[in-house]
Structure formats: C-alpha cells, structure tokens
UniProtKB/Swiss-Prot annotation:
This is Lipoate-protein ligase A. NCBIfam families: lipoyltrans. It comes from the Bacteria. ATP binds at residues 71, 76-79, 134.
Length: 338
C-alpha cells in the first residue's frame, strides 16, 4: 500500500475545506504523507491567535459577502479568492519536515519555468524588475506525533481587495494579539501568463510524486462526495461557528462615540472571548437612565450586532418614553460594530 495520499477539494467553502484538513490531519496514519489541494472563494483567513476586529474590515466583509475563517495554525491574516491555490502537506514524525514540502513547491514552480526562493517568515519570493515580491505564504501546525504545512500561491488574485478587507477601520481599537505583517506581493500570472489553478495543481502533484518516487490516484472531495471522516459534521460546525471565528479573539478594548441631537454618547467596551466583559457609558443626555441601563445589560452579551440589537429592543420596552433615542443608538451600534 502506498504511503502517499492525494486529496483535491472541489468545494470553495473555507469552512468545509478547513474542516476536511483538520479531520484528515487527526485521522491520518503516522506513516502517511498527504497532499491536499484546495481553494476558497472570497474569504479572510486569520491565524489561531488573531483578533478579527483588529485584523479585518469586518463591516466591509459583511457588506461584500466575504467570509471569515479562523485556522488552527498560527501566522497572519490573508485574503483568499479563486485566484489563490491552497496546499497542505501532512506527515507523521519524524518524517514531517517543512523544508521538504517547501522544496516540493519550489520544484513545481521550477517545472513551470518560475524561479522562486524561500525567504523570511515562511514565504516564497520571486525577483522582479522592481525588487523581491512574495508569491506564497505558509503556516504550520505540529502535535506530538505529526505536523502539517499549509499555504497559498498567488496565481491571479485580485490584489486590490487585500487592502479592502485586511486594513481595518480606524475604530480606536486597542488590542492584544498578533498583528499581521504586510508584504509586497505579486501574482504568478505576471511571470507566466496563462497559469491557472489546474496547471499549478498538476505541477505540485507531479513534484510530490517525483520527490517520493511514488504515484497515487487523486481522491476528489466535495460536500456530495466526502471520504470517511469521523467527526466531520462536528468539525464543520466548529469551523463555521461565530464562537470559533470571532469568539476565540484575544481580549481587547473598543471605544465608540457619536453625537445625536439629544446629546453625545461614548461607549467603552472590554471584550473577552468574544463577549462584553465590561461596558462603560458617558453621555451628556438629559435622560441618562436608559443609556446607563444599556451599559449594564450589555455585560456578558456576545460582541456582535444581532446580540446587541436584542438588548436594545428589550430596553425600548422598559423605557417606552425613550424609544426614539434608543432606536437611534441601536442603529448606530449595529453600524459601527460590524
């Protein structure tokens, strides 16, 4: 029986692909060497220890239908679209060696006529007339007996959208956690016109087979054709949950303020594990009682517009004389906290 396994996903859902990756990693035989090829439709993927409110323009992402996905490995935030090809190499220890998987990718690029080198923070770079440009970034995960190396290759990604979603709004956000390092990037299509997902995947597959001097048939994975993956439903539920993608954020503080006709309002949020740990309010309103009640009731609530909306609606029932003002506050918070 071959020690190699090749899996290709035809799903563009990041939560599906990351759930498949995690399940295969947990269940693979220690003597296997696995290559998983996949890609995601519009998604921001963040590292395990990152804060999405700090890393991403969450409001713009929601407006444009861009998903947020937290991976189980470390590293920074990246934007994926169908112009990216994603790869994952897995192996048991002591066989696992990220320099081997890096070399396989370099060999694949070289077979297409692209000379790239490994550089710095787990990147692959090429030399252009205007200097060194990144074409691939990677992250890693290791357990006691196995490890994986996954990353992306920029083929024909919409680089303008990187700034749309990876530069957060100036929200007066003071956050603990890891901040992404921004790099100068380029698409491989600028070096090799006509390159696409199918061609780069074929090159990576061949380099994988050549390195180990073995060949296997690909297993095509889709929501309609899942391999036997015990625990997949639970893993997918986790990957797609608000609790995992947002609730795992490190502690942070957020200040928002505005002025209405009836007075100014300033809210200070301390957020822990995606929930409001403390809320302070300052206002020059002539009727501060409803706003003070709001601050008190927001403690312990999930830090997302839907949960805060529910508190505001309940408060309007308790303070009917202030319904108009509370509705304004509700609409404002729904906008600034996205």
């Amino acid at each position: 029986m071959s020690s190699l396994r090749l899996l290709i996903s035809d799903s563009y859902d990041p939560w599906f692909n990351l759930a498949v990756e995690e399940c295969i990693f947990r269940q693979m035989s220690p003597d296997q060497r696995v290559l998983f090829l996949w890609r995601n439709a519009d998604t921001v993927v963040i590292g395990r220890a990152q804060n999405p409110w700090k890393e991403c323009n969450t409001r713009r992402m929601e407006q444009d239908g861009v998903k947020l996905a937290r991976r189980s490995s470390g590293g920074g935030a990246v934007f994926h679209d169908l112009g990216n090809t994603c790869f994952t190499f897995m192996a048991g220890k002591p066989e696992y060696d990220k320099t081997i998987s890096t070399q396989i990718i370099l060999n694949a690029l070289a077979s297409l006529g692209i000379q790239a080198t490994a550089s710095g923070r787990n990147d692959l770079v090429v030399i252009k007339d205007d200097g060194e440009r990144k074409v691939s970034g990677s992250a890693y995960k290791e357990t006691k007996d196995r490890g994986f190396h996954h990353g992306t290759l920029l083929l024909n990604a919409d680089l303008n959208r990187l700034a749309d979603y990876l530069n957060p709004d100036p929200k007066k956000l003071q956050a603990k956690g890891i901040t992404s390092v921004r790099s100068r990037v380029t698409n491989l299509v600028e070096l090799l016109p006509g390159i696409n997902h199918e061609k780069i995947c074929a090159a990576i597959e061949q380099a994988f087979f050549n390195y180990y001097d073995e060949k296997v048939f690909a297993e095509i994975i889709s929501p309609q054709a899942l391999p036997d993956l015990p625990g997949f439903a639970e893993q997918f539920a986790k990957q797609s949950s608000w609790e995992w993608n947002f609730g795992q954020a490190p502690a942070f503080s957020h200040l928002v303020d505005t002025r209405f006709v009836w007075g100014g309002i300033e809210l200070h949020f301390d957020v822990l594990h995606g929930a409001i740990d403390r809320c302070q309010i300052f206002t020059d309103s002539l009727n501060p009682a409803p706003l003070e009640a709001l601050a008190e009731r927001l403690q312990g609530v999930e830090y997302r517009p839907a949960a805060i909306d529910a508190v505001c609606l309940q408060l309007s029932d308790d303070f009917p004389e202030s319904q108009a003002e509370l509705l304004q506050v509700q609409c404002w918070l729904a906008e600034v906290l996205r």
